[in-house]
Amino acid sequence: MDDLSEANGSFAISLLKILSEKDKSRNLFFCPMSVSSALAMVYLGAKGNTATQMSEVLGLSGNGDVHQSFQTLLAEINKTDTQYLLKSACRLFGEESCDFLSTFKESCHKFYQAGLEELSFAKDTEGCRKHINDWVSEKTEGKISEVLSPGTVCPLTKLVLVNAMYFKGKWKAQFDRKYTRGMPFKTNQEKKTVQMMFKHAKFKMGHVDEVNMQVLALPYAEEELSMVILLPDESTDLAVVEKALTYEKLRAWTNPETLTESQVQVFLPRLKLEESYDLETVLQNLGMTDAFEETRADFSGMTTKKNVPVSKVAHKCFVEVNEEGTEAAAATAVIRNARCCRTEPRFCADHPFLFFIWHHKTSSILFCGRFSSP
């Protein structure tokens, strides 16, 4: 599973870099883990050069059974007895006239707890789009709707890969609501007021001199997950951090051994992010081109028909970050800016930052985010 976690991690950072390049000021929030597993499910049915390109983009080595490893990984992350709420909707929708193989459908269920549903895009395009949106809404308990906007599918659509995630975690120890107040958040162009949460407690924190930034780890309940925030120093642009970022560096920068636990004054904005992506172009930029081209796509492990390309890869994610924790906020004497606290570390996320939600047991990046525009 270590190989797979590493492959998924590298893919996550590749995805983050491409998405962040597209629009420097846009908020980002996506689940690389679910994009990887959804694509790996499609990879089950890929052959020839299509399969080679997919395995290269996903960083999958030929060693061991990739699908078996994904099965183990997904079972661990999607456990039901957790303190965090993770609702996922992942399914492949195929044009019913494509004659999909039952062996492929069975493997989707076995390894990915996901299915292939056959619809008639040719006969009822709009009906299919609505059906897919309704299914996603139901699976995410209404948190995510409209994963496919009007015009995203057409009568010629053959394969649509849909993937949506809703995440709500509770902090190990909550932020006390009575200290949340409006504070300015500085973007490159302007200042906007955000609801800034405050907590004065022991956290693991570090400073990376290489890129001039602070690193803070905030544990979620039961410490199964944690949010790791990369916050550039006031004098450094977030783009500098993004440019330097690689999966290896992220592991080194956020290694618990290199962080020091101490009393920290933490200021973190309340967040509610809902982000949507059509990933076809992004994946083509990464080198996965044949899968999307009618004359080159080889999915003979999935269907008996030739010329069945992937038409759409839709991904949508929703996260809420607020004060809620599983334990009451400890009664701390809050001294925000008093002189006696000058020596104490301060982590004030009042300008753009990156954040990652880690699943510790599997060393997986569950989510990647950038908050740059309140």
Curated annotation (Swiss-Prot):
Keywords: Cytoplasm, Protease inhibitor, Serine protease inhibitor. Pfam families: Serpin (PF00079). The keyword Cytoplasm applies. InterPro entries: Serpin_B9/Maspin (IPR000240), Serpin_CS (IPR023795), Serpin_dom (IPR023796), Serpin_fam (IPR000215), Serpin_sf (IPR036186), Serpin_sf_1 (IPR042178), Serpin_sf_2 (IPR042185). GO terms for molecular function: serine-type endopeptidase inhibitor activity. It is found in: Cytoplasm. It comes from the Eukaryota. CDD domains: serpinB8_CAP-2. The record marks R339, C340 as: Reactive bond. Gene3D superfamilies: Alpha-1-antitrypsin, domain 1 (2.30.39.10), Antithrombin, subunit I, domain 2 (3.30.497.10). Has an important role in epithelial desmosome-mediated cell-cell adhesion. Belongs to the serpin family. Ov-serpin subfamily. This is Serpin B8.
